[in-house]
């Protein structure tokens, strides 16, 4: 059953009024593939626009806080923790991992996915002048904890 449709098939925000407040957490990832020299430029701090990882981290955090403004039926949430980690993975990619937490009545999967996605988009934006062929890929939920459905983790 699709939770965002009412009995007539119309889009509607899920009513979480009667749901218990529980600890919720979600982990998402994204990857940006690029030319090896682009990654070297980022790692050496030689990018003319500044620290690419720092800006992407802040963009991801800000995006998680604004998820309800971007995705129409998401609830506005009082997130208690947002972490966005970026690391070089091999010679030609950056792996982004976002973790969102709260004590609340609905999950934080969309916030974690939005954080990872916007961090990836920010890397693309900052580096497109030197590498227009970058590819954003592998945006996915890795893990979700809390709520009625409990713990879910992606299968390896």
Curated annotation (Swiss-Prot):
Enzyme class: lyase
Disulfide bonds: none
Any one Pfam family match given in the protein's UniProt record, by short name: MoaC
Pathway stated in the Swiss-Prot or TrEMBL entry: Cofactor biosynthesis; molybdopterin biosynthesis
UniProtKB keywords: Lyase, Molybdenum cofactor biosynthesis
Catalytic activity: (8S)-3',8-cyclo-7,8-dihydroguanosine 5'-triphosphate = cyclic pyranopterin phosphate + diphosphate
GO annotation, biological process: Mo-molybdopterin cofactor biosynthetic process
Coiled coil ranges: none
HAMAP family registered for this protein in UniProt: MoaC_B (MF_01224_B)
Function summary: Catalyzes the conversion of (8S)-3',8-cyclo-7,8-dihydroguanosine 5'-triphosphate to cyclic pyranopterin monophosphate (cPMP).
Database matches in PANTHER family: CYCLIC PYRANOPTERIN MONOPHOSPHATE SYNTHASE, MOLYBDOPTERIN COFACTOR SYNTHESIS PROTEIN A
Assembly, per entry: Homohexamer; trimer of dimers.
Protein name: Cyclic pyranopterin monophosphate synthase
Organism: Stutzerimonas stutzeri (strain A1501)
Taxon lineage: Bacteria, Pseudomonadati, Pseudomonadota, Gammaproteobacteria, Pseudomonadales
């Amino acid at each position: 059953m699709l939770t965002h449709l009412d009995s007539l098939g119309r889009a509607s925000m899920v009513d979480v009024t009667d749901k218990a407040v529980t600890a919720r957490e979600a982990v998402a990832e994204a990857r940006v593939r690029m030319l090896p020299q682009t990654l070297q430029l980022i790692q050496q701090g030689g990018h003319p626009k500044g620290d690419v990882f720092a800006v992407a981290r802040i963009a991801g955090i800000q995006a998680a806080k604004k998820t309800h403004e971007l995705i129409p039926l998401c609830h506005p949430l009082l997130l208690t923790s947002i972490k966005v980690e970026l690391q070089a993975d091999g010679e030609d990619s950056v792996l982004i991992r976002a973790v969102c937490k709260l004590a609340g009545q609905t999950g934080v999967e969309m916030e974690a996915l939005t954080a990872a996605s916007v961090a990836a988009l920010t890397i693309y934006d900052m580096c497109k002048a030197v590498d227009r062929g970058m590819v954003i890929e592998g945006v996915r939920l890795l893990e979700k904890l809390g709520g009625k459905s409990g713990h879910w983790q992606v299968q390896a």
